[in-house]
Amino acid sequence: QSTNDLIKACGRELVRLWVEICGSVSWGRTALRMTLSEKCCQVGCIRKDIARLC
């Protein structure tokens, strides 16, 4: 799967993706993650966006 694929994921699906990309979910930078979560849900994001927050 390409790192540029646009992913529209919300809730559990987003968490599942996060674990797949990062290996685990630690919610340290909460504000930034919430912003990204909303973006991923509404307009989509790419795997690189999520990987940056690992």
Curated annotation (Swiss-Prot):
InterPro entries: Insulin-like, Insulin-like_sf, Insulin_CS, Nem_insulin-like_b-type, Repro_Hormone_Insulin-like. Relaxin is an ovarian hormone that acts with estrogen to produce dilatation of the birth canal in many mammals. It is found in: Secreted. The lineage of its organism: Eukaryota, Metazoa, Chordata, Craniata, Vertebrata. Belongs to the insulin family. This is Relaxin. Disulfide bonds join 10-41, 22-54, 40-45. One of its GO terms (molecular function) is hormone activity. The modification Pyrrolidone carboxylic acid is found at residue 1. GO terms for cellular component: extracellular region. Heterodimer of a B chain and an A chain linked by two disulfide bonds. Keywords: Cleavage on pair of basic residues, Disulfide bond, Hormone, Pyrrolidone carboxylic acid, Secreted. It holds the Pfam family Ins_beta.
